[in-house]
C-alpha cells in the first residue's frame, strides 16, 4: 500500500533530467547555477534555514541577527536570579555516622620447638660464623640479614673482624659464541659445477655476505648435479628471485633429498613457486620453509596443504602453520606418507 506522498512522487520517476536541462535557456541555466551555489542541502554545519531557499510567502516582520540573539539570551540568563529553595538547607546531619570497623590485629604465636639434646648442645656451642653458614644452607634469609651478624666477632686467629653477609654463588659457566660457518662458498660452487662425487652435502647457513647472483648459480649448478643430496641456505638473506631459481631447479633435479630455506626474506610468491615445483619433483623428501620475514597468509597455507595431500613423497615439512585447518591437513598427509614408507620397508623385509 503506497502512502499519499509516494503516489505524488511516482510521476517524477521517468523524467529525463538531460532533456529538461536542454530546454532551459542560458539565462535560466545561470540562474540555476546561482541557486545551487548559494544552497547546500547536504551540509550539516549550516542552520536549517540556510540549506534551502526560503519558501515562505510572508514578508519579514523585522531583521534577524543570530549573534545578537545569542548575546541577548546569555545576558538575560546572567541577570536572572536563581530560584530560592523551598526548604532551606540547615546543615543538620540525620541518621547514624558511618564508623568503619577496626580489623583485628593478627598476632603470631611462637611455637615451641623441642630438639634432641645432641642438637641443642651443638647449636649452643656453635659460633656465629657456623650459625651464619647454617642459615645460608637452610635459606633462612631473615637470619642472614640480622644486624647481629654484622657485629665484630673473634675469628680463629684471635683477631676481630666483621662477619661478611655475603653468600657465594656458583660460578657461571662461560658461553662461547658459535664459530662462523667454515664452508668455502666459491670452492663449493666449483665442486658442484664439476659434479664432484665427494660433495654430497652443502651447508651455507648463516653466511650473510653471499651475493644473490651467487645463490642463483648454486641453484643452476644443482640442475645438472647428480651427487648433492642435502642443500641448506638458512639465514642467508635469500629473497624471492633466489626462491624462483631453486623452484626451477626442483623441476629438473633428480638427486636432491633435502632443501632448507628457513629464516630468509622469501614472501608468499616465492614459497608458492617452491610448492608448485614439488609437483614435478619425485626425489625430494624434506623441505624447510619456516621463519620467513613476513607471514605467508591463509591462501598460501591452503595451497601448501593441497600440494602435500597430492604429494606422497614428502616425509618431513618444516613450517609452523598459523591456521588450524591447513595444520591438520598437513599433519594427516605427512603421517600418511610416512606410513606408506614404513609399509614398503616391512614388505621388503618379509621378502
Curated annotation (Swiss-Prot):
Protein family: Belongs to the tropomodulin family.
SUPFAM superfamilies tied to this protein: RNI-like
Annotated source species: Rattus norvegicus
UniProt-annotated location(s): Cytoplasm, Cytoskeleton
InterPro entries xref list: LRR_dom_sf, TMOD
Record-level Gene Ontology MF annotations: actin binding; tropomyosin binding
Keyword set, alphabetical order: Actin-binding, Cytoplasm, Cytoskeleton, Phosphoprotein
Pfam families per UniProt: Tropomodulin
Function per UniProt: Blocks the elongation and depolymerization of the actin filaments at the pointed end. The Tmod/TM complex contributes to the formation of the short actin protofilament, which in turn defines the geometry of the membrane skeleton.
Subunit structure: Binds to the N-terminus of tropomyosin and to actin. Binds to TMBr3 as well as to other low molecular mass tropomyosins (TM5a or TM5), but not to high molecular mass tropomyosins (TM2 or TMBr1).
Protein name: Tropomodulin-2
Any GO BP annotation: muscle contraction
Amino acid at each position: 500500500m503506497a502512502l499519499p506522498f509516494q503516489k505524488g512522487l511516482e510521476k517524477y520517476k521517468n523524467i529525463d533530467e538531460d532533456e529538461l536541462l536542454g530546454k532551459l535557456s542560458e539565462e535560466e541555466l545561470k540562474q540555476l547555477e546561482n541557486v545551487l551555489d548559494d544552497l547546500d542541502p547536504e551540509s550539516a554545519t549550516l542552520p536549517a534555514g540556510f540549506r534551502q531557499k526560503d519558501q515562505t510567502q510572508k514578508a519579514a516582520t523585522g531583521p534577524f541577527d543570530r549573534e545578537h540573539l545569542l548575546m541577548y539570551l546569555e545576558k538575560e540568563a546572567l541577570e536572572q536570579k536563581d530560584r530560592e529553595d523551598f526548604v532551606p538547607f540547615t546543615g543538620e546531619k540525620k541518621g547514624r555516622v558511618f564508623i568503619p570497623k577496626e580489623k583485628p590485629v593478627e598476632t603470631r604465636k611462637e611455637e615451641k620447638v623441642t630438639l634432641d639434646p645432641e642438637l641443642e648442645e651443638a647449636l649452643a656451642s656453635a659460633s656465629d660464623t657456623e650459625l651464619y653458614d647454617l642459615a645460608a644452607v637452610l635459606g633462612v634469609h631473615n637470619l642472614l640479614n640480622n644486624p647481629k651478624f654484622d657485629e665484630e666477632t673473634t675469628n680463629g686467629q684471635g683477631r676481630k673482624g666483621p662477619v661478611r653477609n655475603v653468600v657465594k654463588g656458583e660460578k657461571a659457566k662461560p658461553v662461547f659464541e658459535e664459530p662462523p660457518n667454515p664452508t668455502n662458498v666459491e670452492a663449493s660452487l666449483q665442486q658442484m659445477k664439476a659434479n664432484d662425487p665427494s660433495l654430497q652435502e652443502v651447508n651455507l647457513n648463516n653466511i650473510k655476505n653471499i651475493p644473490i647472483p651467487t645463490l642463483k648459480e648454486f641453484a643452476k649448478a644443482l640442475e645438472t648435479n647428480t651427487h648433492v643430496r642435502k642443500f641448506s641456505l638458512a639465514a642467508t638473506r635469500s629473497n624471492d628471485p633466489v626462491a624462483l631459481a631453486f623452484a626451477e631447479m626442483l623441476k629438473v633435479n633428480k638427486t636432491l633429498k633435502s632443501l632448507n630455506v628457513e629464516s630468509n626474506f622469501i614472501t608468499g610468491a616465492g614459497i608458492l613457486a617452491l610448492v608448485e615445483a614439488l609437483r614435478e619433483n619425485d626425489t625430494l623428501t624434506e623441505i624447510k620453509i619456516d621463519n620467513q620475514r613476513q607471514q605467508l597468509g591463509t591462501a598460501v597455507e591452503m595451497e601448501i596443504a593441497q600440494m602435500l595431500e597430492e604429494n606422497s613423497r614428502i616425509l618431513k615439512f618444516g613450517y609452523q602453520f598459523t591456521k588450524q585447518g591447513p595444520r591438520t591437513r598437513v599433519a594427516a598427509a605427512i603421517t600418511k606418507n610416512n606410513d606408506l614408507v614404513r609399509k614398503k620397508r616391512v614388505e621388503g623385509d618379509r621378502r
